[in-house]
A protein has these predicted regions:
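Structured alpha/beta or helical-core interaction and ligand-binding surfaces enriched in interleaved
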Residues: 1-286
Length: 286
């Protein structure tokens, strides 16, 4: 069971000036033993436990930008100061002048125990840019410099982990809504898709019941695995929402979803959450 609040990604985001509901989106591709996933809508804090479950013993915060923590001159606080405000112990690794001006590289990296990541992403604030990558617990300053060099020289569409033998998962979040991740773990893409289904259903139930949050079960792994086996790209939209039942229409797409792509006229499948029995099922759409 997971808790889904009324301030989650599906609740606070919308599409267009008409503020249409934000769709579930999921795409996955595999190459050379790496899985690359783009998905939405999810806040980093809504996925953090999945990241922790497959990560090395430590995590490097590569980039962190937010308007939630500002100094007296209304400038964003440095990530290390944000971690201190949240009571998260970490090691600060300055990158130096060589990294200045390199797209995606900050002035410093934060390294912390992976189990502290949920405390950092505790839901009380929102990063509009966030990049994380796992590292060994005994990572050296030289290795962190090498990591930063790889991050700064890898193209957006190039595989990253193939150049980083010690890392298992890389996460990048934009607007605390859009998710891009790369992993060596073949089970993580299905876990992300299962979480998205739960987040969409849970946000609808929280709004319906006017409760601060709802508790919903996650689908068993066979449901997202069945979807991924059928097609790599999916879009989802809420259907029926009652206190007993939530349905989500799912349609396969020819390409990854982009903002502006509407849900097709006809769904291919329907995911149904039986709230009272705590079960999920997938059926052909009627």
């Amino acid at each position: 069971m997971i808790e889904v609040g009324q301030q989650g990604a599906f609740s606070v985001n919308s599409v267009g000036i008409e503020r249409q509901p934000f769709p579930l989106s999921f795409s996955v591709r595999e190459a050379e033993g790496l899985w690359r996933v783009s998905a939405g809508a999810a806040q980093a804090g809504e996925l953090v436990d999945l990241f922790v479950a497959v990560a090395n013993d430590a995590v490097a915060v590569v980039s962190l930008e937010t308007n939630s923590y500002l100094d007296e001159d209304w400038h964003p606080l440095q990530p290390a100061l944000i971690a201190a405000e949240l009571g998260v112990p970490c090691t600060v690794h300055p990158l130096g002048s060589w990294a200045s001006g390199t797209n995606g590289l900050p002035e410093e990296l934060l390294v912390m125990d992976r189990d502290l990541l949920p405390r950092l992403l505790d839901g009380t604030w929102s990063p509009y840019e966030l990049s994380l990558i796992d590292v060994p617990a005994d990572v050296t300053p030289e290795q962190l410099d090498e990591l930063a060099l790889v991050l700064g020289t890898t193209g957006v569409d190039e595989p990253l982990l193939s150049r980083l033998g010690d890392s298992r998962v890389w996460f990048s979040g934009h607007d605390d809504c859009y998710v891009l991740l790369e992993t060596r773990d073949p089970a993580l893409p299905a876990a992300v898709l299962a979480r998205l289904l739960s987040l969409l259903a849970g946000s609808a139930l929280a709004e319906l019941t006017e409760e601060p949050f709802s508790r919903v079960p996650e689908p068993g792994p066979w449901i997202p695995e069945q979807l991924i086996a059928a097609a790599p790209h999916w879009i989802g939209a809420l259907g029926t929402v009652t206190e007993d039942l939530v349905t989500i229409g799912l349609a396969a797409l020819p390409d990854p979803w982009r903002l502006g792509i509407s849900f097709p006229q006809q769904a291919d499948l329907t995911a149904t959450l039986d709230v009272r029995h705590g079960t999920w099922r997938i059926t052909p759409a009627e």
